[in-house]
Amino acid sequence: MKEFLAYIVKNLVDKPEEVHLKEVQGTNTIIYELTVAKGDIGKIIGKEGRTIKAIRTLLVSVASRDNVKVSLEIMEER
């Protein structure tokens, strides 16, 4: 699933080399922490959050096959 998410995000941004994805596993829960270049955050979120909502919907659909809850968080660069 991590590779699937990375593929989607890298094809949306201008700087795919700056896409970093961290997977944090819990019991029946996976949290993905996504970091992208500052200029690409708007492309990931999309107009009125539509793009990030669609990405999250895809993740939930894929994860439901394995009875796992999944969450995607966009992390701020420091």
Curated annotation (Swiss-Prot):
Predominant location of this chain?
cytoplasm
Q: Name one GO molecular function term.
A: RNA binding
Reported function:
A probable RNA-binding protein.
What are the record keywords, sorted?
Cytoplasm, RNA-binding
- What NCBIfam families does this protein map onto? PRK01064.1
**Could you tell me which residue ranges the KH domain spans?**
29-78
Report the source organism.
Answer: Chlamydia trachomatis serovar D (strain ATCC VR-885 / DSM 19411 / UW-3/Cx)
In the UniProt record, which is one GO cellular component term? Answer: cytoplasm
What family is reported? Answer: Belongs to the KhpA RNA-binding protein family.
- This protein is called what? RNA-binding protein KhpA
Supply the HAMAP family for this chain. Answer: KhpA
Location in the cell reads: Cytoplasm
Q: What is the top-level taxon of the source organism?
A: Bacteria
